[in-house]
């Protein structure tokens, strides 16, 4: 992992913890209050698969959305609500605001960031790009608005492979940032000429191939599901590699009854909901007594609590603003991604 201090990681863990866990009665009260506020304010709650289960359930119950970052962006853009509450990390709120500048975008906390975002400062990344002006700049969605504004394309893990293949077919060479593991996976799958930025996700980088192989021995009939932000040695052990939505689909379609899952454990809520007859096991994140920093759950995603959702709704706090000078530049690569994926959907449905 690069360019991120241990202090930031420790502080994120501390901030994510609630000193007094909610009782069932308190939780029900918060959920009812949030639902009422959403309705009164013509607001909608969108949540990422990595948020805690109670937040995901609330989004579904109130007519919102639980999805990966691509569908979160699409849902917020197309929904008629005047206010969008984004339960996720900072770049997701920024993306929602860029795509729908006329809407009010709130987040439970503005402190929920991402190690990939932190590890890709715009000044350093821009200098890297300037050294290779002939290359097309492709950035992962897990980046700041400023980095997106420097890019030619924005991608998510659910569409990155197809977009890079398309660019390669056009004869383009690529600068990729910031996740080195996802970039290396795409490079290996496509053969594309890619220069990789040296960033990583603190959750996925902690999965260990040796311990994963040991776990497979304990569950010989299990299928291994791996997010491509994981190290290459972990990916090589996978039965299915993909984005959050793609891993959920794999859990539904593969015949196995047991799955070892190498991604944030927040995804278990949706997997268990859709596959109640199947067993899901967390892939190991540290071996032989070593301490894990994320322990298979993003500390920043864990900051999205019921208390903070209600507070931002009632008080209008943690509103997302994006520098107006960045918006025209950042929206171009985002719309390229949305247009590309929409065209791919239409093509797929036409071939069905």
UniProtKB/Swiss-Prot annotation:
Pathway: Cofactor biosynthesis; NAD(+) biosynthesis; quinolinate from iminoaspartate: step 1/1
Hydrolase is among the record's keywords: no
Keyword set, alphabetical order: 4Fe-4S, Cytoplasm, Iron, Iron-sulfur, Metal-binding, Pyridine nucleotide biosynthesis, Transferase
Sequence intervals crossing the membrane: none
Subcellular location: Cytoplasm
Top-rank EC class of the record's enzyme: transferase
Catalysed transformations (reactions): iminosuccinate + dihydroxyacetone phosphate = quinolinate + phosphate + 2 H2O + H(+)
Single Gene Ontology BP annotation: 'de novo' NAD biosynthetic process from L-aspartate
GO molecular function: 4 iron, 4 sulfur cluster binding; metal ion binding; quinolinate synthetase A activity
GO cellular component terms attached to this protein's record: cytosol
Binding annotation for [4Fe-4S] cluster: 114, 201, 298
Enzyme Commission (EC) number: 2.5.1.72
Free-text cofactor note: Binds 1 [4Fe-4S] cluster per subunit.
Chain sites annotated for binding iminosuccinate: 48, 69, 140-142, 157, 227-229, 244
Superkingdom per UniProt: Bacteria
Cofactor(s) required for function per UniProt: [4Fe-4S] cluster
Record keyword Ribosomal protein present: no
Protein role: Catalyzes the condensation of iminoaspartate with dihydroxyacetone phosphate to form quinolinate.
Family membership: Belongs to the quinolinate synthase family. Type 1 subfamily.
Protein known as: Quinolinate synthase
Native source species: Pseudomonas putida (strain ATCC 700007 / DSM 6899 / JCM 31910 / BCRC 17059 / LMG 24140 / F1)
Gene (name only): nadA
